[in-house]
Amino acid sequence: LILRRKSTLAVRFNFTGTVMFPKKDAKRPFVKEMEKNGRKMLSMNFGIKESDNNMAFVEAFDGEQETIKSKNADNENIEIKWKDRFDDDVVSSVASYRKTTIDLGEEFDGRHEFVTLYDAIKYLQENLPKYNGKVTVTGQMVKEPYNGKYYDKFKIQSVYAVADDKKNRLLITADIYYNKDSVDKTDWKTEKKIVVDGYIQQYINKDEGNKFIPQQFVFNASKYDENNEKHKKLLDYKMKYIDISKKTMQHLLWECVMLNGAETVEFDESQLTKAQKEQIELGIRTLNDFRPAGSIFGDRVTEYRLFDPKLTGDFADGIVDADMSASEFEDEIYVMASDENMDDVMKKAEKKDEPKVEEEETKTDSEPEVDEDDLF
């Protein structure tokens, strides 16, 4: 089978917010030190809080090694001796996508580049608790199988300080594959919500290569004002990329906003009891008389909400046909064993065989227009 699509676009994340450290006695603490086969290992885990009710955790894991296997700027295999990993010439020779970059500002001596996550973790362990302010963390989102389910992991590649007035946001950028049958409009009339049961591509291991993995996305138009002309134009614009008519698989690069918590909801009569509604009908009370103090939150959810198509590169003209028949696409969907976990997958994988994945960098110096900023 010869597939006619270009190299895989990694699913990238760009999270901006406040750092939240796990409790010291947490099952997954900020940093956990361990030893395996005589090698020191480190794992890191901390949250990026977008708001009081929306937060995502990012992570890193690495260990000491005699020889570091990496890639140079030409994507060629290189080997680095452990003792040489801080050498400036060595660091500069490594491809940017194989390095971890940290910049917590001039107070922390600016930009630092590491050829191992192990050293990046140690640096963050010492310095991140001393830092006050917002950060942006970027990296790759990976779906890891465990006992028949996928769990989303956000692997750190860079951490840097940002201005306090930068808008908090949990953003991912994904090349999403979908067709007409992927789009579920069941709740459109009642909730202004569309569910897209699409797919993303991910490198599995050297035996499997790149495979398609199911991923659900949501388009929520409940905040669009039908009386606002710009909102109407924006809605029509986005719908032409969502409510597609083709049966063959299409794909498009989307910016998505991650919601991992409870969303604030507007207070209205639907939240009143029958007795309270009767008082309003009789003019005894008004809706404001029953309005609770503070914000009202809905159910806790984890959703990736379609925000804006990224019309760059191969997608400059919009959505692209995947150029695959239905059977070809089905053959490329990854099927995991019900009892499989990531350790099973990684046993087959070797870093030196892992291909370079294209990275669609998320611009951090521009934000969507204010009128559109919260339409997701």
Question: Where is each model-derived feature located?
Answer:
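OB-fold and OB-like single-stranded nucleic-acid-recognition modules
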Residues: 2-376
